[in-house]
Swiss-Prot record:
Protein family: Belongs to the IlvD/Edd family.
PANTHER family according to UniProt: D-XYLONATE DEHYDRATASE, D-XYLONATE DEHYDRATASE YAGF-RELATED
Source superkingdom: Bacteria
Assembly and oligomerization: Homodimer.
UniProt keyword Iron-sulfur, yes or no: yes
Active site (catalytic residues): 468
InterPro entries named among the record's database cross-references: Dihydro-acid_dehy_C, DihydroxyA_deHydtase, DiOHA_6PGluconate_deHydtase_CS, ILV_EDD_C, ILV_EDD_N, IlvD/EDD_N
Protein name: Dihydroxy-acid dehydratase
Enzyme class: lyase
Gene Ontology CC, one term: cytosol
Protein's organism: Caldicellulosiruptor bescii (strain ATCC BAA-1888 / DSM 6725 / KCTC 15123 / Z-1320) (Anaerocellum thermophilum)
C-alpha cells in the first residue's frame, strides 16, 4: 500500500517510532492510513460542528479496518469577511487549502483521504486537492443550516443583509432589524439558501465524489452523522479497489455537474470553481461549454435567494438525486459514470423520485426552459461575464441605462444608503478582480443594500469582482478582462450608456470602439493596492476569472 513508504521494513523503524509516540499500535500502523482532512474551527458557523462529523468519519474508518489520522486546514466565513478588507482573503484561501492538503498528504503518504468541508471556498479547495493529489478520496460536508423563522415568516442570512438596506431607508425599525439578526441563523451549518457553499456541496454529490444526501441533509440531523460514518467506511473500500478521483472526475462528470447547477439555479461562483477543479485533471471547461449546457437544461428549482425555499425543503423534496432523476427523463445527464458509492450515476438515482413538485418542478413544467446561469459577452466583457438569470427580475432581462462608476464595493454601498443611486442606473464596480482587488471580493453588501432600499428591480450592477451566492438581481460578475488588465470595464465613464440583453447573452458599452481604445491607452499603469504578503504574491500569479481564477 502507498503508506508502506513511511512504515514498512527495518529501515522505517524511526518513522514507526514516531507513530508510536502518538499512541498508535503496531496493528494500527499496519492498516491503511486514512487522512481525515477537517476544516473545523470556532469562527465559521458552517464549521463549528465539524468535530462531530470527523469523529463519525473516524468511527467509520475503524469499522472498516483502517486507521484514521486527522489534521486541520483553514476556513474563512464569507459572511463575517463581507464588506471590508477581509473579503480580499476569501477566494485566495481556496488555493491555500488545496496547497496545504497536497503538502500534508504527500509528506505523510496516506493511502486515502476523507475531506470534511462545508463553506464557500473550503469545498472547492478540497476538491482541487483531491483532483491534484489523486489518491482515493471522498468528501463529506457538514450540511446546511436550517432556515430561520420570525413568526410564520422564513428568513436567512441574506434577509439580514437586505435588512440593513431596508433599515437605512426607513422601511423597517431597529427592532425589526434586531429580530432578523437574532433569528435568521438558528444554528450550525452552511447558510441555508442555494448560496455558494450549498451549491458546491450539492455538486460534489453530482460529480461523484460525495455520497447521495451530502448536499442537502441538514447539519443538525442524525442522518448527517450516519452519512459521515458511511463515508468513513466507503473510503476504505475505495482504497482497497484503488478508485481514484481521476477515475471519477471525467469530462462527462463535469457536464453533469453543470447541468444540475443550471437546474438548481446555483451560485455564480461555480463558474470559478468547476473550471479550477477540472483544470487539475487536465480538463478545460470553457465558458462556451457552460452556455451550451445552460441552453439545453431547464431550471427546476428557485431556492433562496431566487425564491422562498431553502435547502431543507430541497432535502425533503427528494434532494439532489431527485433533481438528477428529473433531468435524466430527457437524457440531460450521463448515467454510466463511476461514483464513490461503487454504483453508477444511473443506479444511484433510479429510485430517487420527487416528493414535492412545489420545490422541484417536473421536467415538463420548469421555471424556464434554460438554466439558471448565463455567460454574457460583448465589448464590455470580451472574455465573458456571468449572471444568475434565475434571480433576475423580468423587467431587467433587457435593460439600457447610464453607468454609475465606482472603484470599490464600499463606495457603492455608501452611495446606495445615501440615496445617490437612481432607478435605471447601471452600477459599475471595477478594480475588484482577481488581480485588481486583489482577491476578487464578493459584492453582497451593495446588492443587498439595493434590495433593502427597494431598487433591486430597477438597477443593474456590473463588476469584475464576484457575487455571493446569496445575491439576487441583474448582477453581472467576473467581467473579463478585468480593469487591472486594461479590460474595457476600465474605460467606462459616468453617464455612458450600457445595454443588457440576457436572452441574447450580450453586455454592451455604447461607446465607439475607437473611443474605448483611446480611453484605455491614456490610463496610467495599474498600481497594486497591496504590496506585501500573500495577497501580493497571489496578485502576481492569479489568472483571469474566465479561467477559474487559477494560479500560474
Amino acid at each position: 500500500m502507498r503508506s508502506d513508504t513511511v512504515k514498512k521494513g527495518f529501515e522505517k523503524a524511526p518513522q514507526r517510532s514516531l507513530f508510536k509516540a502518538m499512541g498508535y499500535t503496531d496493528e494500527e500502523i499496519r492498516r491503511p492510513l486514512i487522512a481525515v482532512v477537517n476544516s473545523w474551527n470556532e469562527v465559521v458557523p458552517g464549521h463549528i460542528h465539524l468535530d462531530r462529523i470527523a469523529e463519525a468519519v473516524k468511527a467509520g474508518i475503524r469499522l472498516a479496518g483502517a486507521t484514521p489520522m486527522e489534521f486541520n486546514v483553514i476556513g474563512v466565513c464569507d459572511g463575517i469577511a463581507m464588506g471590508h478588507i477581509g473579503m480580499k482573503y476569501s477566494l485566495i484561501t481556496r488555493e491555500l487549502i488545496a496547497d496545504s492538503i497536497e503538502a500534508m498528504v504527500m509528506a505523510h503518504q496516506f493511502d486515502g483521504m476523507v475531506l470534511i468541508p462545508n463553506c464557500d471556498k473550503i469545498v472547492p479547495g478540497m476538491l482541487i486537492a483531491a483532483a491534484r493529489v489523486n489518491i482515493p478520496a471522498i468528501l463529506i460536508s457538514g450540511g446546511p443550516m436550517l432556515a430561520g423563522k420570525i413568526g410564520d415568516k422564513v428568513c436567512d442570512l441574506n434577509s439580514v443583509f437586505e435588512g440593513v438596506g431596508a433599515y437605512s431607508a426607513g422601511k423597517i425599525s431597529e427592532e425589526d432589524l434586531y429580530a432578523l439578526e437574532e433569528n435568521a441563523c438558528p444554528g450550525c451549518g452552511s447558510c441555508s439558501g442555494m448560496f455558494t457553499a450549498n451549491t458546491m456541496n450539492c455538486l460534489s454529490e453530482v460529480l461523484g465524489l460525495a455520497l447521495p444526501g451530502n448536499g442537502t441533509i441538514p447539519a443538525v440531523m442524525a442522518a448527517r452523522i450516519r452519512l459521515a460514518k458511511m463515508a468513513g467506511m466507503k473510503i476504505v473500500e475505495l482504497v482497497e479497489k484503488d478508485i481514484k478521483p481521476s477515475d471519477i472526475l471525467t469530462v462527462e462528470a463535469f457536464e453533469n455537474a453543470l447541468a444540475v447547477d443550471m437546474a438548481l439555479g446555483g451560485s455564480t461562483n461555480t463558474i470559478l470553481h468547476l473550471p479550477a477543479i477540472a483544470n487539475e485533471v487536465g480538463i478545460k471547461l470553457n465558458l462556451d461549454i457552460i452556455n451550451a449546457i445552460s441552453d439545453r437544461t431547464p431550471n427546476l428549482c428557485k431556492l433562496s435567494p431566487a425564491g422562498q425555499h431553502h435547502i431543507e425543503d430541497l432535502y425533503f423534496a427528494g434532494g439532489v438525486q431527485a433533481v438528477m432523476n428529473e433531468l435524466s427523463k430527457k437524457g440531460l445527464l450521463h448515467l454510466n459514470l463511476m461514483t464513490v458509492t461503487g454504483k453508477t450515476v444511473g443506479e444511484n438515482i433510479k429510485d430517487a423520485n420527487v416528493k414535492n413538485y412545489n420545490v422541484i418542478r417536473p421536467i415538463d413544467n420548469p421555471y424556464s426552459e434554460t438554466g439558471g446561469l448565463v455567460i454574457v459577452r460583448g465589448n464590455l466583457a470580451p472574455d465573458g461575464a456571468v449572471v444568475k438569470k434565475s434571480a433576475v427580475p423580468p423587467k431587467l432581462m433587457k435593460h439600457r441605462g447610464p453607468a454609475r462608476v465606482f472603484e470599490s464595493g464600499e463606495e457603492v454601498f455608501e452611495a446606495i444608503l445615501k440615496g445617490k443611486i437612481q432607478k435605471g442606473d447601471v452600477i459599475v464596480i471595477r478594480y475588484e478582480g482577481p488581480k485588481g482587488g486583489p482577491g476578487m471580493r464578493e459584492m453582497l453588501s451593495p446588492t443587498s443594500a439595493l434590495a433593502g432600499v427597494g431598487l433591486i428591480e430597477d438597477v443593474a450592477l456590473i463588476t469584475d469582482g464576484r457575487f455571493s451566492g446569496a445575491t439576487r438581481g441583474a448582477c453581472f460578475g467576473h467581467v473579463s478582462p478585468e480593469a487591472a488588465e486594461r479590460g474595457p470595464i476600465a474605460a467606462v465613464q459616468d453617464g455612458d450608456m450600457i445595454s443588457i440583453d440576457i436572452e441574447n447573452k450580450t453586455l454592451t458599452l455604447e461607446v465607439p470602439e475607437e473611443e474605448i481604445k483611446r480611453r484605455l491607452e491614456i490610463l496610467p499603469p495599474f498600481e497594486p493596492k497591496v504590496k506585501k504578503g500573500y495577497l501580493y504574491r497571489y496578485s502576481k500569479l492569479v489568472r483571469s476569472a474566465s479561467t477559474g481564477a487559477i494560479l500560474e
